Amino acid sequence: MPYTYGTPEWEEAYNKRLQERIANEPKPFIIFLPEWLKEWEKYLQNDAKYKELALPNWENAIVIHITPAPQFGLDHDIFVRMDLWHNGECRSIRYIPKSEVGKNPKDFIITASIDRWFAVGRKQLDVVKGMMQGKLKLKGDLPTVVKAVKPAVRIVETVGEVGGKYEDELTPEETEKFRATVNELLPEFGLV
């Protein structure tokens, strides 16, 4: 039986599984898996440059919506919520279920295929230009995002600094392991 998102049981089970994966999975972690998201969260929480650039009154989350890409082992949509707050505080970066997406009208939802997210992470696609060109679909107030260009660019820069292995760099065996991991975690934690 899957855990119910937002409950203490969910939180406890998710954190336990996350700690097991951090301890047991080989590094570099695969980008967008929970253990990598935790590394990214910690990095952003301690990044002085991001804190310096962040807007003092920012109270918005950014939801990264990654659409399915079976060729990379991704059979389901994944939603990653970056809970960002005043002066560069990063409260968390983690998976959320689709049912939670858009509940807060201040949240920004950016949707793209995983290969577009690879391009963003590798600095081959500027996140703001990508939104303006329709390569990344934004749901939210574009003028507010445009005001936050510098912190947004810094967030993208941190992806490369955290490091990790992109799904298009995986061997066929690693791709199948990635697929199995996602196909196990999402239903178990009520994320599909």
List the predicted regions and their residue ranges.
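Feature captures hydrophobic
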Residues: 1-192
